[in-house]
Amino acid sequence: MGAGGRMSVAPNNSKCEKKESRSVKRVPHTKPPFTLGQLKQAIPSHCFKRSLLRSFSYVVYDLSLSFIFYSIATTYFHLLPSPITYIAWPVYWAFQGCILTSVWVLGHECGHHAFSEYNWLDDTIGLILHSSLLVPYFSFKISHRRHHSNIASLERDEVFVPRLKSAIPWYSKYLNNPPGRALTLVATLFIGWPLYLAFNVSGRYYDRFACHYDPYSPIYSDRERLQIYISDAMIFVAAYVLYKIAMAKGLAWLVCIYGVPLLIVNALVVTITSLQHTHVALPHYDSSEWDWLRGGLATVDRDYGVFNKIFHNATDTHVIHHLFSSMPHYHGVEATRAIKPILGDYYLFDDTPIHVALWREAKECLFVEPDEGDNNNGVFWYSNKF
């Protein structure tokens, strides 16, 4: 397992304790010897072109698969003998959850104006796709744009902002064990996304309550408030449709067909996005050191195997996405290959199996602090040493 060739794992001589001693080469935190313009010149020009037809084909493909899974479940599952249904339903939930996560990714693509050349069309499609997954489209689009503008800044980044060692809750040390870690991971995966939207959990610090559903939240400016009302209205419409379905089909039917897959979407969104920004080799910066390019490079591409394609390469092309966020997802792999020779050690790739990476980062990335005796006091690294 490695991080772009920069992670080495010492042999494990204690099989009983199964402890690993890692020597991780960190991503450089000094100003890079290249510019954003030089990176752009290295990328084929067609990678920046957005094709409405091609983008829309992914929407049709994902929604068609989702409908096929739905049709199979509602048409045939009730005909199966009881023991088989206990297998069929979890398979449906997994498949449907993965495809709906792909739909979530396409909505996110619309929010970056990476879907087509038409802003209004991108927003219309993104609003429909995200609202169907109970995501307030414009609310998330705006906060996510600020995340891209301030990534890896301890003061201004919008999400996955690590705590300083001095600011971690008193109970954190008591959760720093396998049972506590497992409990925290399960809660984070399945309710972390709605908690972020509703209560700004893991988000940037504000001096008052921040919520993605509140048009007067400190997250938004006066000129953005109308968009928040539109997002809320669409969430209300989606919730009303779900209510009518529950009344017609029953709550249990709705939970099986839609509710559980939506939980899977929540878990996958948190898994993908948290692992894109959490790694012991990645720096964070305070205002004395931060700049946009170094912040944009403080992210990691990971390998999800066949799921890279299923999730439209949101998993293994996140570095290029932060550098050129309006680039369509279907050009991300080619563009990444083009700039890797220039990025050198500034590019981080980790092919650690995802379940292993989740557990490792939950164990090792508890808070950030500067290195002792380091003159770069504005550069912070993940640690778990209380």
From Swiss-Prot:
Domain of life: Eukaryota
GO cellular component: endoplasmic reticulum membrane
Residue span of motif Histidine box-1: 108-112
Pathway: Lipid metabolism; polyunsaturated fatty acid biosynthesis
Membrane topology: Multi-pass membrane protein
Reaction it catalyzes: a (9Z,12Z)-octadecadienoyl-containing glycerolipid + 2 Fe(II)-[cytochrome b5] + O2 + 2 H(+) = a (9Z,11E,13E)-octadecatrienoyl-containing glycerolipid + 2 Fe(III)-[cytochrome b5] + 2 H2O; (9Z,12Z,15Z)-octadecatrienoyl-containing glycerolipid + 2 Fe(II)-[cytochrome b5] + O2 + 2 H(+) = a (9Z,11E,13E,15Z)-octadecatetraenoyl-containing glycerolipid + 2 Fe(III)-[cytochrome b5] + 2 H2O; a (9Z)-octadecenoyl-containing glycerolipid + 2 Fe(II)-[cytochrome b5] + O2 + 2 H(+) = a (9Z,12E)-octadecadienoyl-containing glycerolipid + 2 Fe(III)-[cytochrome b5] + 2 H2O; a (9Z)-hexadecenoyl-containing glycerolipid + 2 Fe(II)-[cytochrome b5] + O2 + 2 H(+) = a (9Z,12E)-hexadecadienoyl-containing glycerolipid + 2 Fe(III)-[cytochrome b5] + 2 H2O
Disordered as annotated region, ranges: 1-28
Keywords: Endoplasmic reticulum, Fatty acid biosynthesis, Fatty acid metabolism, Lipid biosynthesis, Lipid metabolism, Membrane, Oxidoreductase, Transmembrane, Transmembrane helix
Residue ranges of the motif Histidine box-2: 144-148
Motif Histidine box-3 boundaries: 318-322
N-terminal signal peptide: none
GO biological process: unsaturated fatty acid biosynthetic process
InterPro entries reported in the protein's UniProt record: FA_desaturase_dom (IPR005804), FAS_N (IPR021863), Fatty_acid_desaturase (IPR012171)
Domain writeup: The histidine box domains may contain the active site and/or be involved in metal ion binding.
Function in brief: Converts linoleic acid to alpha-eleostearic acid (18:3(9Z,11E,13E)) and alpha-linolenic acid to alpha-parinaric acid (18:4(9Z,11E,13E,15Z)). Converts a single cis double bond at carbon 12 to two conjugated trans bonds at positions 11 and 13. Can also act as a 12(E) desaturase when acting on the monounsaturated fatty acids oleate and palmitoleate, stereoselectively introducing a trans double bond.
Name of the protein: Bifunctional desaturase/conjugase FADX
